[in-house]
Amino acid sequence: MVREALDSDFDLRALLLREGVEPAFALPAGVPVFVLSDRVFAAVSETKTPQGVAAVLSRRIRPLSGSRFVALDAVQDPGNVGTIIRTADAAGFDGVLLGPECADLFSSKVLRSTMGSIFRLSFAFPEDLSADLRTLRSRGFSVLSSQLDGEPFYSREEIPAPFVLIVGNEGNGISAPVKAEATHRFRLPMRGGAESLNAAVAAGIMMYDLMKHPDQSRCTPHTSPRRSSVPTVLPHT
């Protein structure tokens, strides 16, 4: 993940190395490098088995832009938030809206779970997610809600971009004010005995299916950035 940070436009303030560790990348010029003892490195790292390389970065994000977004409505598990961000990046989405009560994007577990995708996507942090969805609707976005009483997801007509997919809270689903902004309401079929899916799993299924058609997919292997050129920037409140 440190290598991903080096390749990004984030501001790198310092590199931390554990004694005896040789990084598998060239050290950037002009960046302070601190070599720490095992004890000190373990104290600054929150992982049980740190790899011995860490980076100090400025909290810098790309303002929301593009035409394919996922919106998180009080998704509280850090692993789910990070996994959804990683999957959105892999599927070819442009950005993520994190509403109130979501896990902190900059917590260590969320950061690790993104596996570097935080450096490639754009983000917004609305205080009122329903208001931002209303703004997106006014700009021509379809707003997709996943809910138990929705229409079968795989029976839908294709939905071209721009669109935003809402992912709800792990226990309570999508809140009523956010759900009210949906232009399309879907449910994933459950053919076995399970009552529901993990939020990140359900989001991943829907994101990949929304991007499966050639006219919707923008994914070009081994190129970066892969983002849409259509600007859609919401004010950060």
Where do the language-model regions lie?
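Structured adenosyl-cofactor binding patch, chiefly the S-adenosyl-L-methionine
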Residues: 55, 90, 105-118, 176-219, ...
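Acidic/glycine-rich phosphate/pyrophosphate-binding loops and surrounding catalytic core
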Residues: 46-64, 102
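RNA substrate-binding interface of SAM-dependent RNA methyltransferases
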Residues: 7, 61-150
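N-terminal positively charged helical leader segments and presequences
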Residues: 1-45, 219-237
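Active-site/ligand-binding-proximal alpha/beta "capping" segment
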Residues: 144-194, 198
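Short loop/helix-cap segments at secondary-structure boundaries that form the rim of catalytic
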Residues: 23-30, 62-65, 177-180
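Short, polar loop motifs at secondary-structure junctions
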Residues: 1, 18-23, 59, 148-150, ...
